[in-house]
């Protein structure tokens, strides 16, 4: 018999400081992407190759939320606080409770407010957060 695995989006948790994210969009709602160059290389005229490993541990976190999510207000508050006093940073902890993947880092901050859209139906809001010293565990 083959191996059976289970994924349940309800078992993915995301904490921003002491705020628990809720009101996720109905499709992809968390994206974590390395912001550095990873490993680059240069090939010399004689064919010798030199690799350079980017020391950056900065990541970009994108959260896609429903228009009515209370997390929108939290992220806007943190952005406003950061713009006013430079103190709008927080830690990030993402955990897939059914899997073995975890991501954490910080300090983190909101780069700019999500687009504000209104129409016939609800519109998702996408927030971009920079996470310093991020790591997958």
Description of each model-found segment:
Residues 57-59, 64-83:
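Short, conserved turn/kink motifs that form compact alpha/beta structural patches or helix kinks used as
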Residues 63, 92-94, 129:
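Generic recognition of well-ordered secondary-structure surfaces with a strong bias
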Residues 131-133:
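Residues on the solvent-exposed faces and adjacent turns
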């Amino acid at each position: 018999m083959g191996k059976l695995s289970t994924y349940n989006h309800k078992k993915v948790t995301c904490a921003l400081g002491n705020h628990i994210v809720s009101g996720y969009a109905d499709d992809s709602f968390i994206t974590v992407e390395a912001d550095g160059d990873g490993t680059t290389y240069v090939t010399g005229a004689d064919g010798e190759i030199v690799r350079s490993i980017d020391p950056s541990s900065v990541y970009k976190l994108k959260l896609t939320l429903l228009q009515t999510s209370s997390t929108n207000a939290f992220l806007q508050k943190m952005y406003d606080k950061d713009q006013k006093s430079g103190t709008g940073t927080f830690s990030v902890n993402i955990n897939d409770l059914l899997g073995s993947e975890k991501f954490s880092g910080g300090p983190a901050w909101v780069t700019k407010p999500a687009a504000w859209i209104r129409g016939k139906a609800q519109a998702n809001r996408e927030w971009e957060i920079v996470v310093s010293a991020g790591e997958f565990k």
